[in-house]
Design a protein with these regions (language model features):
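Conserved small-residue
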Residues: 1-297
Length: 297
């Protein structure tokens, strides 16, 4: 018989769960403008953040002997240290009894120094990075009443109205959308609207009154229908950004330098250059899988 029981218990949390510090020298070729790389290897998974690791080591006069008292390394020279990772990034340890030098060495013997990069940071493409697209999963967990939902949707309705009634705004809308398709990071729309837009705008340029034709009216109606369909799927453009939270990065740098790991931020604070200091933010995990994910700071 399964019985639920309530009781008080102590839990522990890992402030550096699944993250690594990766020296900026590793961000080369196609990753020169990136700031995080999600890395994979055999039984290894970690989010590596761009860090001036070697500069920090030199500035703090950290020696190889110092590092060996605070962790484990096979490096023979301090200049070889380009990555600092965490035990829970090394999934192999779960299957062999936990963290030990013997277990780490066993893993090293069976892997190469080539890591797979499966993800990196990408900024939002909407309105030059000022807007981000929501999902129905997020909206369903906010508990909005009718009035709040109408307030949230009003900018989107106003946007659709401008697309419907302003030819120049329609041109702006599709210049932005077409640019997103060409960068290779967005799937091409199956309705072919971007390709049709290219033809439509050429005709508008050549014929002053083309926007009064049935051809333009049909195109405009298809665009408006597509925007409404996106809203029904929960794809609402909101003031926001895509960002990867770097948990306690300065504290990890302090730890490898042997310094006291005091917190750089107060409880309930995050730092993001996209927003003004003191702004109230709603953070949501992606993918958004539970109503417990939203975090207000």
């Amino acid at each position: 018989k399964l019985v639920a029981e309530q009781k008080q218990t102590e839990i522990t949390n890992d402030i550096w769960d699944g993250e690594s510090l990766l020296d900026e020298s590793m961000f080369e070729n196609g990753y020169a403008d990136k700031h995080i790389l999600l890395l994979r290897n055999k039984f290894f998974k970690s989010c590596a953040f761009r860090t001036k690791l070697q500069k920090w080591i030199k500035d703090k006069n950290i020696t190889l002997a110092d590092l060996k008292t605070r962790g484990f390394t096979l490096a023979t020279d301090i200049s070889q240290i380009v990555m600092v990772t965490t035990p829970n990034s090394l999934k192999y340890l779960k299957f062999v009894g936990g963290l030990s030098e013997k277990n780490i060495c066993k893993w090293v013997e069976n892997v190469t120094d080539t890591f797979g990069v499966v993800k990196w940071d990408k900024s939002t493409k909407f309105f030059h990075g000022d807007m981000v697209q929501s999902s129905y999963q997020l909206l369903n967990t906010l508990g909005l009443d009718k009035a709040q939902a109408e307030e949230l949707l009003k900018p989107s309705f106003d946007y659709i109205s401008l697309v419907r009634n302003d030819v120049e705004f329609m041109r702006y809308h599709f210049t932005d959308a077409y640019a997103r398709e060409k960068d290779g990071e967005e799937k091409k729309a199956p309705d072919g609207l971007a390709d049709r837009a290219d033809v439509i705008f050429r005709l508008l340029f050549s014929c002053t009154h083309f926007n009064t034709t049935a051809l333009y009216a049909n195109f405009r109606d298809d665009v408006v229908s597509g925007l409404k369909s996106s809203l029904r799927r929960g794809h609402i453009l909101l003031n926001g950004t895509n960002a990867t939270l770097f948990g306690n990065g300065p504290e990890l740098l302090k730890y490898i330098a042997g310094e006291k790991t005091t917190s750089e931020l107060k409880k309930g604070q995050i730092y993001c250059k996209r927003f003004e200091s003191g702004a109230k933010l709603l953070c949501a995990r992606s993918p958004h899988i539970t109503m417990g994910n939203p975090y207000c700071v």
